[in-house]
Amino acid sequence: MKLPRLRTILLTPLVLIALLYLAGVIMVARIDRTVGPLKGEPAGHRTVAIFGASGTAGDGILKAALADPHVDTVHVITRRETPRIREGVDSGKVVMTTHMDYLDYAAIREQLAGVDAVYWAIGISSVGVDEETYGLIHVDFPMAFVEQWVPVSAKDNISFHYISSSDISEDSSAMWVREKVRAENSLFGFADGTKMKVIAYRPDYIGPTQEEAHLGQRALYGFFRPLGAAVKATEIGQAMLEVTARGDEFASGDKLGTFSIVRYAGAYELRQSSTSPSQ
């Protein structure tokens, strides 16, 4: 086989992939991501709690909450401290509680009674993990929490924001998908008829915060973001804060995919840039 022909054979798939990638980028760029302005005053979210703040998504949520002038207190429930958590504690905005048993919350019920919204980011990869352990962490942990939080809450309306996963379906044969679906259905079902609403967030690839990201993660984020298949961890936090502030615009059982997360994070940034803490 002659060299020019071999080169053509090798390059053709690469060119096709590049063209498909470019087409995807163009399609995503044309999507309208604007969100209407917040109607009325923001719903109360002066006091929030974050579970999983030591992980990738949780670190971004905490970073967003620390930067929000409308959030007075952030309860961080964690097994270990991180530089971000320490920064929050030193600022006086974060109350850190070391907690080891995520099936029993009796020791922290009093401090959680005054929480307006909970941002739940506890999770692990399914690689090398059996179904029982994965279900314990992704289903049993959050269910145990909401079952114990709702009865002691002193607030009239509370919200629970759960990080799920993109493209999940009850028809899937994958273990981790089944468990994510079970988690959503269990949380939505429990919230029905209570003063708590549950919102699920279904991001694709989550890019770590600038301080935590390594070269490989930056490369993956840079590849997937133009395709609309990546979101920054801080954007998840901003979207959660915006959804919380919009109150009745969202109902229990609502789900936000990557595009919606990015849209509401953008709406959050726009609102913050045009208002002051006193407004």
How should each PLM-predicted stretch be described?
Residues 1-41:
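N-terminal membrane-anchoring alpha-helices
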Residues 36-70:
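N-terminal Rossmann NAD(P)H-binding glycine-rich loop of SDR-like oxidoreductase domains
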Residues 47, 124, 132-136, 140-181, ...:
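Conserved Rossmann-fold NAD(P)-dependent oxidoreductase catalytic core, especially the SDR/UDP-sugar
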Residues 48, 90-144:
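NAD(P)H-binding glycine-rich loop region in Rossmannoid oxidoreductase-like domains
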Residues 72, 185-210:
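Conserved beta-loop-beta element that borders a ligand/cofactor-binding pocket
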Residues 74, 139-145, 179-187, 233-236:
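Conserved catalytic Lys-bearing alpha helix of Rossmann-like short-chain dehydrogenase/reductases
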Residues 77-84, 205:
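Short, polar loop motifs at secondary-structure junctions
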Residues 225-253:
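C-terminal helical subdomain
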